[in-house]
Amino acid sequence: MSTTGKGGKAKGKTASSKQVSRSARAGLQFPVGRISRFLKHGRYSERVGTGAPVYLAAVLEYLAAEVLELAGNAAKDNKKTRIVPRHILLAIRNDEELNKLMANTTIADGGVLPNINPMLLPSKSKKTESRGQASQDL
């Protein structure tokens, strides 16, 4: 005889057998179920495997953590405690791989990287040195 009741669940199970999300099983913070739903309803393919949303969630979580870490460092360098779009832009553009990944991306309110062509900078010539010596000769 089986111990199953009306609902099909075993009677011996306790309340500790709660559902565990796929994000928790994978050890992720990003929602695997939501990403799975987006993949299915987005009509990217007729069928979506069970591992695809887990892998995509892991990749997105890694990229977000990487950008946030670099943006936090940029905020610290500017003596700020809050990350603003400017810090995110500086983080992405100063990292070679992230810059290549997001080359054609515009970040709203990010501004531009500070860059002055060395040719436009005033050159340090001997004229400034001779002025100092001339004043001492008098």
Swiss-Prot record:
Region (Disordered): 1-23
UniProt modification remark: Monoubiquitination of Lys-124 gives a specific tag for epigenetic transcriptional repression.
Modified residues (Phosphoserine): 123, 125, 130, 135
Gene3D superfamilies: Histone, subunit A
Subcellular location: Nucleus; Chromosome
Residue numbers of N-acetylserine PTMs: 2
Database matches in InterPro entries: Histone-fold, Histone_H2A, Histone_H2A/H2B/H3, Histone_H2A_C, Histone_H2A_CS
GO molecular function: DNA binding; protein heterodimerization activity; structural constituent of chromatin
Modified residues annotated as N6-acetyllysine in this record: 6, 9, 11, 13, 18
Gene Ontology CC entries for this record: nucleosome; nucleus
Positions occupied by motif [ST]-Q motif: 135-136
Cross-link (Glycyl lysine isopeptide (Lys-Gly) (interchain with G-Cter in ubiquitin)) at residue(s): 124
Keywords: Acetylation, Chromosome, DNA-binding, Isopeptide bond, Nucleosome core, Nucleus, Phosphoprotein, Ubl conjugation
CDD domains: HFD_H2A (cd00074)
Cited Pfam families: Histone (PF00125), Histone_H2A_C (PF16211)
PROSITE patterns: HISTONE_H2A (PS00046)
Annotated function: Core component of nucleosome which plays a central role in DNA double strand break (DSB) repair. Nucleosomes wrap and compact DNA into chromatin, limiting DNA accessibility to the cellular machineries which require DNA as a template. Histones thereby play a central role in transcription regulation, DNA repair, DNA replication and chromosomal stability. DNA accessibility is regulated via a complex set of post-translational modifications of histones, also called histone code, and nucleosome remodeling.
Subunit structure: The nucleosome is a histone octamer containing two molecules each of H2A, H2B, H3 and H4 assembled in one H3-H4 heterotetramer and two H2A-H2B heterodimers. The octamer wraps approximately 147 bp of DNA.
Protein family membership: Belongs to the histone H2A family.
Domain commentary: The [ST]-Q motif constitutes a recognition sequence for kinases from the PI3/PI4-kinase family.
Protein's name according to its UniProt entry: Histone H2AX
Species annotation: Tetrahymena thermophila (strain SB210)
